[in-house]
Amino acid sequence: SHSKHHATYVKGANDAVTKLEEARAKEDHSTILLNEKNLAFNLAGHVNHTIWWKNLSPNGGDKPTGELAAAIDEAFGSFDKFRAQFHAAATTVQGSGWAALGWDTLGNKLLIFQVYDHQTNFPLGIVPLLLLDMWEHA
């Protein structure tokens, strides 16, 4: 089930934190780096799924309104153009990953991008707003 799948990332993140503490105590730098990578992967998997669950709606949702609608129109020209670009990002992910809509805190605008695995290609300074799981299990 999806909750068991999500729980795997939480356990992986917790395990990586424990192993990081042990490796730091031993000053084992190669193990530190490995577990920092494992922590990033699993923590991102947890965060992405948490956002994704909140994005899902039993009623299917509709076009956004208010500030989000205005930001989409400004960034993409219209909701339909946004949807087409988001669809293209989602359906062309190579391997495992996500399609993402995020707020660029540096440029103060919305961006669409692909996330490889859970965290690779995720621009710094981005606040994720909408994530679509494109892993094979989704």
UniProtKB/Swiss-Prot annotation:
Mn(2+) binds at S1, H49, D133, H137. InterPro entries: Fe/Mn_Superoxide_Dismutase, Mn/Fe_SOD, Mn/Fe_SOD_C, Mn/Fe_SOD_N, Mn/Fe_SOD_N_sf, SOD_C_sf. It catalyses: 2 superoxide + 2 H(+) = H2O2 + O2. Keywords: Manganese, Metal-binding, Oxidoreductase. Its EC number is 1.15.1.1. One of its GO terms (molecular function) is superoxide dismutase activity. The keyword Lipid biosynthesis does not apply. Binds 1 Mn(2+) ion per subunit. It holds the Pfam family Sod_Fe_N. Its cofactor is Mn(2+). PANTHER family: SUPEROXIDE DISMUTASE 2 (PTHR11404), SUPEROXIDE DISMUTASE [MN], MITOCHONDRIAL (PTHR11404:SF6). Destroys superoxide anion radicals which are normally produced within the cells and which are toxic to biological systems. Belongs to the iron/manganese superoxide dismutase family. This is Superoxide dismutase [Mn].
